[in-house]
């Protein structure tokens, strides 16, 4: 699956949204470390990453060759500033219609339209891959993300009041959302 689109950010600068390639592994890992240190709303902490550049390159190669999964990066100002992905929930017949979606954006680029553009890109890719349902999990306190997802058509289908346990703020409620494609 391939994706490439140039967008104009709200600050007037441009960003290229495209497939992550194996050669992007170092930049993607750096972006992961930065984004996951900037907010408590993401699933993992930077020190929990088990990937090195070689393993990340293999992961990105598998995504680049996949017909139904994708890893998209946003490149602006000469660096990777955001990532997003669509992943199959499972390969068994009863699960093949479902995909998961996630996005992370560097704090310096929040509010510029990257989250919206990457969400739209992932929805488009999920449709093209033949999925019938796109799902995500979001921390209930992440009101900006929830508003973005609702605007894109996602609806809440469940909550887990102790879904995440943050090192700094204790338990966090998570919301499960889905979009019928």
Which residue ranges define each predicted feature?
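Terminal substrate-recognition subdomain of acyl/acetyltransferases
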Residues: 1-13, 103, 160, 167-181
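A short beta-loop-alpha structural element at the N-terminal edge
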Residues: 15-27
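Helix-loop element at the rim of GNAT/NAT acetyltransferase active sites that forms part
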Residues: 30-47
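Acetyl-CoA-dependent GNAT
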Residues: 48-108, 119, 180-181
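Short glycine/proline-centered loop/turn elements that form peptide/ligand docking sites
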Residues: 115, 119, 141-145, 162-168
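Conserved GNAT acetyl-CoA-binding A-motif
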Residues: 119, 126-137
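Conserved catalytic-core motifs of GNAT/GCN5-like acyltransferases
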Residues: 135-138, 150, 155-172
